[in-house]
Amino acid sequence: MTVKVVEGDFLQGASAKYAIVVGRFNSFVVESLLEGALDALRRHGVAESQITVYRAPGAFEIPLLAQQVAVRTKPDAVIALGAVIRGGTPHFEYVAGECAKGLGQVSLQSGIPVAFGVLTVDSIEQAIERSGTKAGNKGAEAALSALEMVGLLQQVGE
């Protein structure tokens, strides 16, 4: 008897429809995340006509917009991008926590994968590192996660 292993890959998601929900706040970082996500999707065969970018004011608003996009447009995956940078007040914890929790709920309630590409960092330097310099581009990583999940979910039940 052989154990069946089901994994996603980056090829099956090329024909899928993707929604990218982007928080505008901290745009100097977020625009690099968006470029990374778009580049990753293009490199894996996703046509620009299959990608729609939606812009929310900030990270706190991303979950509601992602939920409405999921319900109204039925993409195969949502890619959430934003940046929450810690300051001197508890604001960071509220925004970062609610954004993460909200996006998890959107995914579970809609049945549509939501890739989490929202940076939650302690400093501007960390944000810059994670948006295309030393630590890679977390926007590209979120796009790859979305591609993989689309392919994986296509195989569930086969």
Curated annotation (Swiss-Prot):
5-amino-6-(D-ribitylamino)uracil binds at residues 25, 59-61, 83-85, 116. One of its GO terms (molecular function) is 6,7-dimethyl-8-ribityllumazine synthase activity. The active site is at 91 (proton donor). (2S)-2-hydroxy-3-oxobutyl phosphate binds at residues 88-89, 130. Keywords: Riboflavin biosynthesis, Transferase. Pathway: Cofactor biosynthesis; riboflavin biosynthesis; riboflavin from 2-hydroxy-3-oxobutyl phosphate and 5-amino-6-(D-ribitylamino)uracil: step 1/2. The keyword DNA damage does not apply. PANTHER family: 6,7-DIMETHYL-8-RIBITYLLUMAZINE SYNTHASE, 6,7-DIMETHYL-8-RIBITYLLUMAZINE SYNTHASE DMRL SYNTHASE LUMAZINE SYNTHASE. Forms an icosahedral capsid composed of 60 subunits, arranged as a dodecamer of pentamers. This is 6,7-dimethyl-8-ribityllumazine synthase. The lineage of its organism: Bacteria, Pseudomonadati, Pseudomonadota, Gammaproteobacteria, Oceanospirillales.
